[in-house]
C-alpha cells in the first residue's frame, strides 16, 4: 500500500531539489529522514517536511506497518516561475527568474 504527500509552489529551484531527492530514493524512511535532516541544502528541509506528511498519511491507513516504509519515489516537478527585474546602469534591467517546485513523496510498504 502507498502513502503520498505533495507540496506545491515551494520556493526552491527544481534542479537543486532533484540533487537532494536522489539521495533518498529507495531507502527506508528512517534513513531517508536522517539524511534529509542533516543535509545543508534548503531543499533537504523542504523534502523532509513533505516526507513527514506522507508518513503521517500512512499512519491513517489501516493495516500499514509504518516502520517498514520505504521511499518509492520523490518527484520534483517544475512550478510556475516568478519573473522579477533588477535595475542596472544606463536604464537597463536584468531579468531574475525565481523558480518554484512541486514536491511529491510516495512511500511504500516493503
From Swiss-Prot:
InterPro entries: Ribosomal_uL22, Ribosomal_uL22_bac/chlpt-type, Ribosomal_uL22_bac/org-type, Ribosomal_uL22_CS, Ribosomal_uL22_sf. GO terms for biological process: translation. One of its GO terms (molecular function) is structural constituent of ribosome. GO terms for cellular component: cytosolic large ribosomal subunit. Keywords: Ribonucleoprotein, Ribosomal protein, RNA-binding, rRNA-binding. Belongs to the universal ribosomal protein uL22 family. This protein binds specifically to 23S rRNA; its binding is stimulated by other ribosomal proteins, e.g. L4, L17, and L20. It is important during the early stages of 50S assembly. It makes multiple contacts with different domains of the 23S rRNA in the assembled 50S subunit and ribosome. The globular domain of the protein is located near the polypeptide exit tunnel on the outside of the subunit, while an extended beta-hairpin is found that lines the wall of the exit tunnel in the center of the 70S ribosome. Part of the 50S ribosomal subunit. PANTHER family: CHLOROPLAST 50S RIBOSOMAL PROTEIN L22-RELATED, LARGE RIBOSOMAL SUBUNIT PROTEIN UL22M. HAMAP family: Ribosomal_uL22_B (MF_01331_B). This is Large ribosomal subunit protein uL22. It comes from Oleidesulfovibrio alaskensis (strain ATCC BAA-1058 / DSM 17464 / G20). The gene is rplV.
